[in-house]
Amino acid sequence: MRKAAVGAAVVCTAAVCAAAAVLVRQRMKSSSKWGRVMAILKELDDNCGTPLGKLRQVADAMTVEMHAGLASEGASKLKMLISYVDNLPTGDEHGLFYALDLGGTNFRVLRVKLGGKEKRVVEQEFDEVSIPPELMVGTSEQLFDYIAEALAKFVATESEGLHPEPNKQRELGFTFSFPVKQTSIASGTLIRWTKGFNIEDTVGEDVVAELTKAMLRKGVDMRVTALVNDTVGTLAGGRYYKEDVIAAVILGTGTNAAYVERASAIHKWHGPLPKSGEMVINMEWGNFRSSYLPLTEYDIALDEESLNPGEQIFEKMISGMYLGEIVRRVLYRMADEASLFGDTVPSKLKTPFILRTPDMSAMHHDTSPDLKVVASKLKDVLGIPNSSLKVRKIIVDVCDVIASRGACISAAGILGIIKKLGRDTLKQGENQKSVIALDGGLFEHYAKFRECMEDSLKELLGDEVAETIVIEHSNDGSGIGAALLAASHSQYLEEDES
């Protein structure tokens, strides 16, 4: 009996030891996997590093590319497009002006009544219209007729105090956010469609002429006096209220910058210099590229798999279209190599662009003790119902690294513009303010991105110079900015002044 008991005890002890060994191996495996997660995070943090020295190199590279782009066509990754906007709004404008904002699957029509410096914008009305999918791939005539019909309906709703002055034609600012070769303030040929549009017979045509023909067909007596993109519109909107505005930056789904340049510094300009001595330059800075940019394997893979490999590298590192996707790629690697979410990679995590930047922002801003928002996004967006607090903290860390890098190199880009304009140093006895107008959903809604960008710019400038540089939100530049440019380039300006 005693032998049997001893035998049973030995068997039992062996079983316990075996179970303990399995548990130890599991813990070691788990510990090893977690170590791999931390190694991937550290590697990401190192590769995304933005020390001040590197950011200053990025800023200097931006300034060099700006000079090259102004010297001759094709000499720089920056197009440095001449906008033909040589008169920015001053606040003196008065009268009724319209704007049309076409940049996606919806377009807006807007009218403003301007009352000069005392009253500024007296009244403002707008309407938003969806474009039927079939018109995005139809003919040029069909699309512009549809837009002209909407304009006609909008004009018909003018109230008693919102009519143009007697014997004056209505004037329109046209924000057209597609690649255009501008040939004057009110003309430009379409280079190519983007954003789901594919209307072959518009390519190579003057989009203002196409709209004008459609307005004639639909009985709309209106003249396009300014063709602009949303960034130039934002600059105009900012300058209308503050004469110290020198540049505008869009940080949204995409990104771009425009600024006011001395006309004499634009060496590729062959026409007579404008009377104002100034010209707004549309930088198209999303295409900026430099060896100093902190690119990672995730950025390189994203670029290679994109519709435009090798192009828009800066935009792919800082804009709302791509930030969430970079985070997804990092999380996918952690899931694949270190089982971050369990033994199998969640199927939804394999889907490109499933994690949008607003989702990333929501997780990044989660201040709840158990990171409930992160848990909710994992479940609702990525189909991951269960996650530990430890895993959720890692996800917030990844969001922080990617957002901080984007914000810091955005600040370096802005510094590049400030340097080009010679506003990065203080001249003796001068304390001139320089205002940068910012717009776009990323800047407006992603608070941690915005705060990091502003802090980084201050650090790059130094306390004294930072006091003279102001970042200001300029809302709805693509709408009201276009109407203001229609006013500042009105055909009736000389009559009004005489």
Swiss-Prot record:
One GO CC annotation: mitochondrion
Region Hexokinase large subdomain, residue ranges: 229-476
Enzyme Commission number(s) of this protein = 2.7.1.1
Q: State the reactions this protein catalyses.
A: a D-hexose + ATP = a D-hexose 6-phosphate + ADP + H(+); D-fructose + ATP = D-fructose 6-phosphate + ADP + H(+); D-glucose + ATP = D-glucose 6-phosphate + ADP + H(+)
Q: Just give the chief location class.
A: plastid
Binding locations of ADP: G104, T105, N106, T253, G441
Q: Where are the transmembrane segments?
A: 4-24
Its subcellular locations are:
Plastid, Chloroplast outer membrane
Annotated pathway: Carbohydrate metabolism; hexose metabolism; Carbohydrate degradation; glycolysis; D-glyceraldehyde 3-phosphate and glycerone phosphate from D-glucose: step 1/4
Gene Ontology molecular function, alphabetical: ATP binding; D-glucose binding; fructokinase activity; glucokinase activity
Query: Where does the record place the region Hexokinase small subdomain?
Result: 90-228
Residues noted as binding D-glucose in the record, renumbered to the chain: T194, K195, N229, D230, N256, E284, E315
What Pfam families has UniProt attached to this entry? Hexokinase_1, Hexokinase_2
**Residue ranges the record marks as coiled coil:** none
Ranges where the Hexokinase domain occurs: 35-487
Q: Which family does it belong to?
A: Belongs to the hexokinase family.
Q: What does this protein do?
A: Fructose and glucose phosphorylating enzyme.
Any idea what this protein is called?
Hexokinase-1
Q: Which organism is it from?
A: Spinacia oleracea (Spinach)
Gene of this entry: HXK1
